[in-house]
A protein has these predicted regions:
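Primarily recognizes Gram-negative and organellar outer-membrane beta-barrels
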Residues: 1-193, 197-295
Length: 295
C-alpha cells in the first residue's frame, strides 16, 4: 500500500530509559544406548524456564531536570516454560548407508503482562517436530545426503511488548501481544566431494509468518510486527568449498548460489503488489581467516 508518513520527530525534552532483565533456568537429561549392530537410540528431555522484564521509564525535561512521567511509563513482563521430549534412532547399514529418524515434541506456556491497564495474556501450544537423515557414502571421497526438518520459529519476547516507543523519524514502534509462531519445512539434498567441495539443492516453505505492518492511531504512525497468512516457497542451488592452507593456518570458505523465491500465494492473500511474486538472484559469500599463534 501507499502511505504518506509524517516527518514530525519526537519533541526534544523527552527521554525513555528501556532495558531488559533476564533470568533463565533449565534442566536437561539425555540417554543413549546401542541397539544391535550399527544402531543407537537416544532419548532426552529439557525443561526451560524464562523470566524477562522490560522496564520503560518515561521522562520529561522541566526546568533543566528530568521528571519521571508515571502516566506514560510501563513495565512489560514475559515468563515462559518450554518442555521438550525427543527421541532419535540411528543405524548404519553395510558401513555405507547412515540413517537417522527423530521426533521432538515441544510444549510452551507463556504469560504476558503489562502493568499499565493491567493487561495480561496467557497462551500455550504444543508442536511435533520430526527430522530425517539419509546419507550414502560411495567411498571416502564422495557422499550424498538427504535431510528433512520441520522447524518452529517463535517470536522474541521483546516483540510482544506493547509499549509505544517513539523514534527520531516521527514513527513509533510497538510490539504485538497476538504474534503467532512461524512453522517451516526444509528439505536439503547435498553432494560432497573430497570432503572439501559441496553442492546442495534446498527447498523450504512456510504457510505463515510475521512481518512489519503499519497503523495510525491518534495522529501517530505506528510500526508493529503482525501475522500474515500465505505460502512462501524458496528454492536454492548452492556450491561451496571449505579448505585449509599453510599448514592449517589459513582457512578459506567460499560459496556461490542461485536463489528463487515464490511469493505469489502470500502476496495474493495479503493484497500486496504482484510485481514481486517471483524473485530470483545470484548470491555469494566468502570468509578468510588466518591463525598464527606465537609463530
Amino acid at each position: 500500500f501507499i502511505k504518506t508518513l509524517s516527518t514530525t520527530t519526537t519533541p526534544e525534552g523527552t527521554r525513555i530509559d528501556s532495558y531488559t532483565q533476564t533470568r533463565n533456568y533449565y534442566l536437561k537429561v539425555d540417554y543413549t544406548t546401542p541397539v544391535g549392530k550399527g544402531g543407537s537410540f537416544e532419548v532426552g528431555g529439557k525443561a526451560d524456564f524464562n523470566n524477562n522484564v522490560i522496564p520503560n521509564s518515561y521522562f520529561n525535561l522541566s526546568n533543566n531536570d528530568w521528571v519521571f512521567d508515571n502516566t506514560k511509563s510501563n513495565n512489560f513482563k514475559y515468563s515462559d516454560n518450554i518442555n521438550a521430549l525427543y527421541a532419535n534412532f540411528s543405524k548404519t547399514f553395510f558401513e555405507k548407508l547412515e540413517t537417522r529418524i527423530g521426533l521432538r515434541y515441544e510444549y510452551i506456556r507463556f504469560k504476558l503482562r503489562q502493568d499499565v491497564g493491567n493487561i495480561e495474556k496467557t497462551t500455550s501450544y504444543g508442536r511435533f517436530l520430526p527430522n530425517l537423515l539419509v546419507k550414502y557414502s560411495f567411498n571416502s571421497n564422495y557422499d550424498l545426503s538427504l535431510t528433512y526438518n520441520h522447524n518452529l520459529w517463535r517470536p522474541w519476547y521483546s516483540e510482544f511488548n506493547p509499549f509505544l516507543m517513539p523514534n527520531n523519524d516521527g514513527i513509533y514502534t510497538q510490539g504485538n501481544m497476538d504474534l503467532l509462531p512461524n512453522p517451516s519445512d526444509r528439505v536439503v539434498l547435498k553432494f560432497g566431494l573430497f570432503k572439501k567441495y559441496f553442492i546442495s539443492a534446498r527447498y523450504m516453505f512456510t504457510d505463515q509468518d510475521y512481518w512489519t505492518n503499519y497503523k495510525e492511531e491518534d495522529g501517530k504512525m505506528i510500526s508493529f510486527p503482525d501475522n500474515f497468512k500465505g505460502k512462501v516457497e524458496k528454492f536454492y542451488l548452492f556450491a561451496n568449498t571449505n579448505q585449509n592452507f599453510l599448514k592449517n593456518k589459513l582457512n578459506v570458505n567460499f560459496g556461490l548460489g542461485w536463489y528463487y523465491i515464490d511469493n505469489s500465494d502470500f502476496n495474493i492473500r495479503n493484497g500486496l503488489s504482484r510485481d514481486n511474486n517471483y524473485i530470483s538472484y545470484i548470491g555469494g559469500s566468502t570468509n578468510l581467516s588466518y591463525t598464527n599463534l606465537f609463530n
